[in-house]
Amino acid sequence: MKFIILLFALIHITVAANRALIIDYSYYGCNLDCYIASNQENTCGAHDDDVSDQQYHACLCMNYDYFTNLMNCNCFDSNVYYVSSSICSMATASSEFETYDGAPSTMDVSTTDYSSSTEDISFTEDVSFTEDDSFTEYSSFTKYSSFTKYSSSVSSFTKVIWSTLETSSIKGIAATTSSYFTNAQTTSGTANDSSISKPSGSQIFVLCVISVVGFIFFFLFFLSLFV
């Protein structure tokens, strides 16, 4: 019994060490698609004080390539789902300066030539960006009909998003996500890939040692069953 308790303790320590190791790679450090998505957010004015929140989120919401890269940035599926499903609703938020009231376009929109739509169309009235809805509800979507693939992929993601973000394993993700919607225009956002720190050699060595020791104990336990 003591051996089993020790074995599970080592497994738990190994998992905790692995979480500590990958937290520096949360979201933008995952892969090339995440890096491209980060650059696209900077292009839309993530750290530009002259770009309003509505312009910034509308620029991202209307960028099909951004959603594609974000969907492929799947190191943490629940976080990717949360960001992609919320960013368009942020584009409709009221402001004393302006209110974005347009629909997604097949064109990529930059902040330099952005202008609000004059059409009386609202995301909140016509399309609800939840895990159960599909972009095909909009009959005028042509290129965006491919979002049905995205919707079906998203539906398989975990639905308990906030509870996942609150776990200690991805606290770095929660901080990154929060910076999008509360302080997207400041230079303190974590979207800048220069803030990503890679694990030191000592961290990798410790994790490897813990993993090897855990494997040895597991092997001995398995062997004892037949002796």
UniProtKB/Swiss-Prot annotation:
Keyword check for Secreted: yes
Chief location: secreted
Induction comment from the UniProt entry of this chain: Up-regulated upon milbemycin A3 oxim derivative (A3Ox) treatment.
Lipidation (GPI-anchor amidated serine): 200
Cysteine disulfide links: none
Signal peptide residues on this chain, from the entry's feature table: 1-16
Keywords recorded for this protein, A-Z: Cell wall, Glycoprotein, GPI-anchor, Lipoprotein, Membrane, Secreted, Signal, Virulence
PTM summary: The GPI-anchor is attached to the protein in the endoplasmic reticulum and serves to target the protein to the cell surface. There, the glucosamine-inositol phospholipid moiety is cleaved off and the GPI-modified mannoprotein is covalently attached via its lipidless GPI glycan remnant to the 1,6-beta-glucan of the outer cell wall layer.
UniProt subcellular location: Secreted, Cell wall; Membrane
Record has Cytoplasm as a keyword: no
Residues with glycosylation annotation: 192
Prodomain positions: 201-227
Membrane topology designation: Lipid-anchor; GPI-anchor
Example of a GO cellular component annotation carried by this entry: extracellular region
Role this protein plays: Probable GPI-anchored cell wall protein that may be involved in cell wall organization, hyphal growth, as well as in virulence.
Family: Belongs to the IHD1 family.
The protein's name: Probable cell wall protein PGA42
Species the sequence originates in: Candida albicans (strain SC5314 / ATCC MYA-2876) (Yeast)
